Amino acid sequence: MRQTKTGILLANLGTPDAPTPEAVKRYLKQFLSDRRVVDTSRLLWWPLLRGVILPLRSPRVAKLYASVWMEGGSPLMVYSRQQQQALAQRLPEMPVALGMSYGSPSLESAVDELLAEHVDHIVVLPLYPQFSCSTVGAVWDELARILARKRSIPGISFIRDYADNHDYINALANSVRASFAKHGEPDLLLLSYHGIPQRYADEGDDYPQRCRTTTRELASALGMAPEKVMMTFQSRFGREPWLMPYTDETLKMLGEKGVGHIQVMCPGFAADCLETLEEIAEQNREVFLGAGGKKYEYIPALNATPEHIEMMANLVAAYR
C-alpha cells in the first residue's frame, strides 16, 4: 500500500504588497469585495466601495502601514514567513506552504506549491484561533473554489479552530507571565479580539463563544480572578453594531475610572500586524493614557516563538 504524503497549508488573512496607496487600494478592494467579510447588497456596496471607501481610506491606511512596515515587508508577512520556515524545520517530512485569503501569496499558489511536491493529503490550518465565518469561512470558500477546477483532488483535513487547545492556551499564558515579570502585574489584563458585526453572531456565527472560551481557559491557566481579566472587541468598520464591548471605548472608560496599569493581549492574532502594532500598541495606548491611565503595555502575538511552532506541529500531527 502506497504511503500517503501529507503537506501543510498555513492560511492567514493577507496584506498589501507595499505601504503605498495603490497597493493598499488593491488589497482593500479584494478584501472588502468578499461576501464573507461584507454581505451588503452588491447594488449598494459596489458604488460605496469604489466611489467612497477605497479613494478615501487607501491613502490613510497606507500611512498606517508605513508606520509599522519592516525590512522584509509587512509585519504579518514577515512573521508568517517565519512561521512557515520554522514549522518546515520542525516537520521536515511535511512540505509547508503559506497562502493568504487576500493578496500574495494566494491560497491557490499555496495549493499548487503543495501539489507540485506530489502530496496527496493537505492539512489546512487557518491561523485564526477562534472560528468566524468571515475568516475561517473565507478560507474554506476559496479552497473549495480552487479545488473545483482540479482534475485530481487531494485528501483535505481542515482545522476549524483551536480556541481551547491546551498548547495554545499554555503558550498564551507563558507570554502573559513573561510580560508580568518584565513590567509588573497590572491592575487588569485586557484581551482584545477582532470584532465582527453583531448580526453575524445573531445569525449563527459562534465566534463570540469561541472568544469567551479562550478567555476563560487563559484566565484559568493564569490563576487570575475573573474581575482581573476583561474581553473586548476591536477594529470595527461601518455603522452597524459590532460585538461589544469595544476596546477603545473600554480603555477610555477604564482610564477615566482610575485604573492605572493595563496590559493588553490580542489572542485572536497568530501574528502581529497593523491591527495589533498600530491600533492596539499605539492608538489605544494613547486613548488609555489620555483618559488618565498611567501604564500600558501591549503583549506581542505568539508569532514564530518556539512554543507557537510546537503548538502548530502538535495540532497538525494528528492528521499526518
Swiss-Prot record:
Any matching Pfam family: Ferrochelatase
GO BP field: heme biosynthetic process; protoporphyrinogen IX metabolic process; response to light stimulus
Pathway: Porphyrin-containing compound metabolism; protoheme biosynthesis; protoheme from protoporphyrin-IX: step 1/1
SUPFAM superfamilies: Chelatase (SSF53800)
Record GO cellular component, one term: cytoplasm
Null allele phenotype: Cells are sensitive to visible light (which is lethal).
Swiss-Prot/TrEMBL catalytic activity: heme b + 2 H(+) = protoporphyrin IX + Fe(2+)
Membership in a protein family: Belongs to the ferrochelatase family.
NCBIfam families: hemH
HAMAP family named in the record: Ferrochelatase
Protein name: Ferrochelatase
